[in-house]
Structures are given as C-alpha cells and as structure tokens.
C-alpha cells in the first residue's frame, strides 16, 4: 500500500505470504479474511498507537487502502 517504506519488499512479501498461508490453511472466505485483517488493524491501532494519533492514522490507512484497490475496467 505504501509508496515508500522503511521495510524491505522482501520482508513485506515474506510476512504477507505467511499470513495468506494461514488464511488458506483455514479456507477462510473473503468476508472472514477481511474481518480478521480489520481486527488486526484495530488491535494494532489500539495497542501500539497513542490515543491522540489513532484517528488520523486510521484515516490515512483507509485512504491508502482505497487508493490501492484495482479500478474496475470500463469498456
């Protein structure tokens, strides 16, 4: 989602692969996968981000998510 990151692509891809493997192992459908990812994001925000910064970080996260979605193809 991020254009620039302090984390390497290799590190990100490795962790993403491991997380997707867990979802695949449990045959999680899209709605359950999204629920879990949303809960992880909420937990990280609540546990790791100072209360006064949570709203702005959540808004930036939501904007980054929306901007990273594939756009529907139009004919």
From Swiss-Prot:
Signal peptide span: none
Gene3D superfamilies: YejL-like
Listed Pfam families: DUF1414
InterPro entries linked: UPF0352 (IPR009857), YejL_sf (IPR023202)
Source organism superkingdom: Bacteria
Family of the protein in this entry: Belongs to the UPF0352 family.
Protein known as: UPF0352 protein VF_1649
Provenance organism: Aliivibrio fischeri (strain ATCC 700601 / ES114) (Vibrio fischeri)
């Amino acid at each position: 989602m991020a254009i620039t990151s302090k984390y390497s692509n290799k590190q990100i891809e490795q962790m993403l692969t491991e997380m997707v493997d867990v979802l695949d192992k449990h045959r999680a459908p899209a709605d359950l996968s999204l629920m879990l990812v949303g809960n992880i994001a909420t937990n990280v925000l609540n546990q790791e981000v100072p209360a006064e910064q949570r709203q702005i970080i959540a808004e930036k996260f939501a904007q980054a998510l929306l901007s990273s979605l594939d756009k529907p193809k139009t004919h």
